[in-house]
Amino acid sequence: MLEKCPIIALDFSDLASVTTFLEHFPKEELLFVKIGMELYYSEGPSIIRYIKSLGHRIFLDLKLHDIPNTVRSSMSVLAKLGIDMTNVHAAGGVEMMKAAREGLGEGPILLAVTQLTSTSQEQMQVDQHINLSVVDSVCHYAQKAQEAGLDGVVASAQEVKQIKKQTNEHFICLTPGIRPPQTNQLDDQKRTMTPEQARIVGADYIVVGRPITKAENPYQAYLDIKEEWNRIK
């Protein structure tokens, strides 16, 4: 099995913070990074071009959710930036997800966000008025994403096994909310797992933010998580 790299969440507000963070890493260490709303809205497409110029892969995490035509045209624009992965909200429906696939083309990986890892059972039922268990809701969205031709979903590692059962083993599961075993910091994430646990249940990608970006030695923290992530063969 090929060695996998954890995706580093670049949860910064500007380019200066990003460049300072990346200085902790050797230039030959090619990374897979996540650019979210805050950084993208602050710096725009130039941040994509900068990161790509360094040779890193990019997961552009904007979670598009709009009418199909708007999502299609937006994805067409994003495709020109050379991103490697992006996403939409599964709640937008099958037609919107199909439109996203059409706009993005077949190059980048396209994922659907199911339920955020910050969402609890109670919040989902009260705020979203979904009277299912979290895992049933996630699996429902995963099946709809597969129907729409997407490559996979973003979901908690706790739901990965069931997602693979309901779709297939090749359907990608990207899992945020990953925390090393020695950390007690849960922040706003409610459904979390360690890198090793995520690999055991079958996650294909993991996203790690603060345990790396806030570490005293970010590069060593990254290597430790990468080693744990690849421990299960």
From Swiss-Prot:
The active site is at 63 (proton donor). It holds the Pfam family OMPdecase. Its EC number is 4.1.1.23. It comes from the Bacteria. Disulfide bonds: none annotated. GO terms for molecular function: orotidine-5'-phosphate decarboxylase activity. It catalyses: orotidine 5'-phosphate + H(+) = UMP + CO2. Catalyzes the decarboxylation of orotidine 5'-monophosphate (OMP) to uridine 5'-monophosphate (UMP). Homodimer. This is Orotidine 5'-phosphate decarboxylase.
